[in-house]
């Protein structure tokens, strides 16, 4: 077959002056597969172009890149109502990705649907269940042994229903997606909040709950509230110690943890070209920490280089032909615009306890002294889905190499997490891994590990005040090691490496000196490393399982006595009545993430067993009544006890309950267990000042009522000992508030209004008891 460019030239001559887009015609002749693993699933830029043109004609204005990709995947572009921040869009994603902790519940729900095969390309990635304890291979062997039942379930379910399966040790889902599945213009949903990582390759990649994934795998259009678009214009260029991570650390400081809610963050401007493709992925990945729906960069030559180096030059060539649809239109409108001069940007470090508390590295030491944060760094950790690229490892190794040249090793413990088997094998071949070991590092398994709390930490006791510095994305209280007194900071991997060598937050590598083994002072030079290996990537071990062509004989077994897996029972339908005298299970004080609602770490092993995982319901949330975690008053016995035990007591005695929350309730992970658990234990509504996007959708999917105070000050009117009645459900309608009657123990009452974001389809989920119940109703 002729080279792609030659085919284009011939078609141009053949078409002459006829008004066709050359690539649209070429798509008929030179189909390009979405990935090497699915040779019969093709990229449909022709359909993307057609849909964009329909929408452009309707809206009659320039489009942002986000709009092009999102609207280009509309189920009905000719008739879909489109209004940013208001209407719900019905979309057709190109593919689904699931990590092993969330895939269990997603596949259990898909099995319940009764469908024979997934309708779109889908994959499962084993990365969340591997605990960091001793180091790479030993931890991997241990995980395979402990989680054999779950891995077998996921592998056989994947084989049965046509889902690709990436075995334990293959790497972190988002790195695997970037290496194999993401491409410019793709619409991908993943059951992990850091799915936006794929925006570094020009795709719209969105984190969702498992129920959303089930809809898409079932071939049902996926609903998303039409996102607003926040533009971040980048000028200047990165240099020295400043890295791509500093861009998102700066943006997080500007927008805060909820500033991106309901919006796509779209980076653009001349500064983009100074950032590598994997650097763009880092920025998009951590956009989850500002609540953004996703983040995206425009297609450019850095993405083309990455596609070519990862064996996908054919996709890059096709993207070149359709580039007009993979970049924003000139003059497009952003709902908010932020400008950052990369030439003036300084290295940042954010934390502790929240990823939006931003400090220049030069200032964090003095701030820590003032605030009483521990200055000594106990552990430095690099890697994770945010920062585990070849370039990241190379820049960290460049710092480590300088220390070694002066006879130094890390003063702090130091761990390295490769993002994938391909990255691990390549950094071993090119010597980076050995340099990082020589400086005192331990190379962990290709998995999430300490970033999600899978860390058997031995150097401290629970409650001991200490500081760790990571290149991760999230630093909520107790997230990494379950110790609420661990002060976790996030920064770039090269800054982590420098700080681990110095051992203190007071060290600024841009200005400060270290003392070598010979007693002489020296300063670390800004690291420099290749963004991609000069030779080809080393793929390492084969860790992929293709689904068989014929799966008719494939069995998927779930033992009724299993403590790890449990088939799902349908939730009860709405009984047609208002919710009377709801007991308040807990009134939450302050930040309440999905980690607080459904903890990870040791609880990950129960992610496929709803009843067992429900024993962690809200154990991290702070009760406003007593200022304690996992201690609430039982309204019947008047005794204080654990939240899950109290919820089970209420369920056993037929007492329906509600949770009262604060701002941005449910921020963080996409885990739908944080919605399944309250539903399973008898919850009916969650009332807050505001919700994080994914969690709000997950609650709706499970038949719960996520409601917000029409007046946020009404949060203060409710006391943990009150009872609530929610009225107006018989006339439940989009945009129409519900009424809440607060009944105080002294007999007095107050009436407040509660808002919601339900549309007609979502109201049907509530009436049916869940989105899955509604799907089954529609199949009859």
Swiss-Prot record:
Modified residues (N6-acetyllysine): 50, 138, 144, 233, 517, 523, 573, 605, 723, 730, 736, 743
Biological process per Gene Ontology, one example term: tricarboxylic acid cycle
Top-level enzyme category: lyase
UniProt catalytic activity: citrate = D-threo-isocitrate
Transit peptide, UniProt annotation: 1-27
Family note: Belongs to the aconitase/IPM isomerase family.
Name of the featured protein: Aconitate hydratase, mitochondrial
Source organism (scientific name): Bos taurus (Bovine)
């Amino acid at each position: 077959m002729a080279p792609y460019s030659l085919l284009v030239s011939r078609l141009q001559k053949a078409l002459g002056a006829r008004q066709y887009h050359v690539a649209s015609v070429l798509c008929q002749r030179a189909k390009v597969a979405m990935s090497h693993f699915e040779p019969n699933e093709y990229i449909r830029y022709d359909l993307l172009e057609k849909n964009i043109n329909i929408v452009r004609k309707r809206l009659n204005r320039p489009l942002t890149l986000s709009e092009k990709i999102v609207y280009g995947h509309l189920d009905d572009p000719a008739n879909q109502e489109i209004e940013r921040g208001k209407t719900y869009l019905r979309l057709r994603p190109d593919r689904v990705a699931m990590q092993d902790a969330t895939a269990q519940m997603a596949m259990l729900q898909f099995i319940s649907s009764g469908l024979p095969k997934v309708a779109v390309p889908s994959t499962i990635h084993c990365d969340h269940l591997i605990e960091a304890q001793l180091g790479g291979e030993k931890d991997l062997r241990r995980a395979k042994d402990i989680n054999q039942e779950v891995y077998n379930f996921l592998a056989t379910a994947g084989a049965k229903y046509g889902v690709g399966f990436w075995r334990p040790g293959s790497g972190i889902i988002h790195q695997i997606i970037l290496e194999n599945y993401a491409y410019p213009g793709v619409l991908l949903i993943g059951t992990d909040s850091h799915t936006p990582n794929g925006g570094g390759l020009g795709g719209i990649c969105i984190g969702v709950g498992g129920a959303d994934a089930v809809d898409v795998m079932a071939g049902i259009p996926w609903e998303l509230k039409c996102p607003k678009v926040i533009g971040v214009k980048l000028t200047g260029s990165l240099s020295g110690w400043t890295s791509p991570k500093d861009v998102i650390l700066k943006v997080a400081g500007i927008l805060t943890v909820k500033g991106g809610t309901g919006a796509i963050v779209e980076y653009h401007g001349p500064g983009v070209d100074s950032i590598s493709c994997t650097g763009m992925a880092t920025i998009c990945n951590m956009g989850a920490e500002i609540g953004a729906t996703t983040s995206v960069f425009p297609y450019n030559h850095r993405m083309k280089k990455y596609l070519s180096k990862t064996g996908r030059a054919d996709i890059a060539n096709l993207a070149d032909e359709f580039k007009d649809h993979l970049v924003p239109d000139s003059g497009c409108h952003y709902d908010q615009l932020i400008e950052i001069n990369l030439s003036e940007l300084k290295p940042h470090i954010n934390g502790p306890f929240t990823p939006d508390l931003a400090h220049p590295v030069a200032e964090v030491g003095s701030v820590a002294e003032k605030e009483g944060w521990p200055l000594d760094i106990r552990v430095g950790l690099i890697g994770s889905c945010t920062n585990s690229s070849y370039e990241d490892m190379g820049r960290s190794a460049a710092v480590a190499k300088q220390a070694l040249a002066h006879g130094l090793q890390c003063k702090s413990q130091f761990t390295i997490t490769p993002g994938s088997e391909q990255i691990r094998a390549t950094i071993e071949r090119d010597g980076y891994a050995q340099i990082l070991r020589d400086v005192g590092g331990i190379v962990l398994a290709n998995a999430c590990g300490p970033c999600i709390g899978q860390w058997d930490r031995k150097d401290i006791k629970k409650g001991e005040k200490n500081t760790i510095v990571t290149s991760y994305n999230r630093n909520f209280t107790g997230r990494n090691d379950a110790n609420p007194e661990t002060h976790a900071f996030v920064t770039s991997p090269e800054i982590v490496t420098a700080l681990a060598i110095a051992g203190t937050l007071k060290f600024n590598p841009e200005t400060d000196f270290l003392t070598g083994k010979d007693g002489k002072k020296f300063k670390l030079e800004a690291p420099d490393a290749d963004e991609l290996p000069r030779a080809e990537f080393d793929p390492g071990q084969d860790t992929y399982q293709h689904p068989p062509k014929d799966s008719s004989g494939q069995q998927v077994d779930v033992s009724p006595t299993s403590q790890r897996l449990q088939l799902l029972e349908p939730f009860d339908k709405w009984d047609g009545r208002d919710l009377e005298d709801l007991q308040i299970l807990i009134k939450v004080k302050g930040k309440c993430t999905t980690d607080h609602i459904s903890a990870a770490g040791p609880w990950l092993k129960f992610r496929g067993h709803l009843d067992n995982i429900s024993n962690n319901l809200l154990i991290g949330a702070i009760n406003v009544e007593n200022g304690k975690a996992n201690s609430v008053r039982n309204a019947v016995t008047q005794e204080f006890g654990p939240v899950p035990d109290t919820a089970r007591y209420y369920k056993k005695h037929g007492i329906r309950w509600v949770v009262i929350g604060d701002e941005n309730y449910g921020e963080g992970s996409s885990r739908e267990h944080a919605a399944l658990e309250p539903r399973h234990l008898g919850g009916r509504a969650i009332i807050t000042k505001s919700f994080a996007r994914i969690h709000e959708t997950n609650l709706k999917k499970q038949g719960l009522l996520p409601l917000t105070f029409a007046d946020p000050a009404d949060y203060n009117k409710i006391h943990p000992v009150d009872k609530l009645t929610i009225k107006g459900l018989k006339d439940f309608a989009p945009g129409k508030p519900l009424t809440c009657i607060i009944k105080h123990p002294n007999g007095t009452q107050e009436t407040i209004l509660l808002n919601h974001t339900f549309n007609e389809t979502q109201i049907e989920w509530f009436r049916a008891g869940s989105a899955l119940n509604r799907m089954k109703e529609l199949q009859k």
